[in-house]
Amino acid sequence: MKLTLRVWRQKNADADGAMSTYEVDNISSDMSFLEMLDTLNEELIIKGEEPVAFDHDCREGICGACSLVINGDAHGPERTTTCQLHMRSFNDGDTIDVEPWRAAAFPVIKDLVVDRSAFDRIIQSGGYISAPTGAAPEAHATPVPKPDADFSFEHAECIGCGACVAACPNGSAMLFTSAKVNHLNVLPQGAPERETRVLDMVAQMDSEGFGGCTLTGECATACPKGIPLPSIAAMNKEWLRATRKARG
């Protein structure tokens, strides 16, 4: 395959960025999108040019590091992570636009790499269990109803890639935050801190500069792990419950 790439290049958060055009050839349809970018960078290095900076780690759809807007879609045309997107999803001769996540809370570090530490701070504010749970109990000593277990597992699949924020016209992080709240709050171990957890995490999310949620649903559509839109409603219910309890 021969492709034309229009790639966002930006030295740092304070510099102005622009799209740069590159031609790449001999791209196999079996390559992942990141392998295609590797090929581009190899050619740029041979020419003595600066390679394109982009984020990646596991390349197995687990870590959530890869974060590209491809032809206007977070992670590209398929509902998967960028590292699991293959070039067979494109046609020979295509022009492909490659940009970083676009959100005020995700400033550009360089080229296609953005700073997503705002997500880390949301988790640090309450996305954990610190209440003493004692020694490891016998496996069946703390029963968890299957619907609760399924609900928790479904939300624990969130990898924090940020596609929900990139896809949202408001740059909202509600889907991410709701996934992190919901996967702990329904478990017995997470119940003692459920009120403080949701209040603290929502407050931290708001302080990071993410936009407000208007339930457009773009977040759930873009999520490569299928976190459902009703997750947001579940968190809102938790937040209202905790707020009323805090007010007495």
Question: Predicted segment positions?
Answer:
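Eukaryote-biased recognition of intrinsically disordered, low-complexity regulatory segments
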Residues: M1-E23
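Structural beta-strand/beta-sheet cores of well-ordered domains, especially the beta-sheet scaffolds
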Residues: L3, S20, G64, D94-I96, ...
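Acidic/polar N-terminal loop/beta-strand segments that form early-domain functional surfaces
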Residues: W8-Q10, D25-I27, D57-R59, N71
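Short, contiguous acidic and Ser/Thr-rich linear segments
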Residues: S20-S32
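Ferredoxin-type iron-sulfur electron-transfer modules in oxidoreductases and energy-metabolism complexes
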Residues: M31-E50, I96-G248
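A basic, amphipathic helix-loop patch mediating RNA/tRNA/ribosome contacts
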Residues: T39-D73
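A generic, well-ordered mixed alpha/beta core segment in the N-terminal half of proteins
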Residues: C63-A118
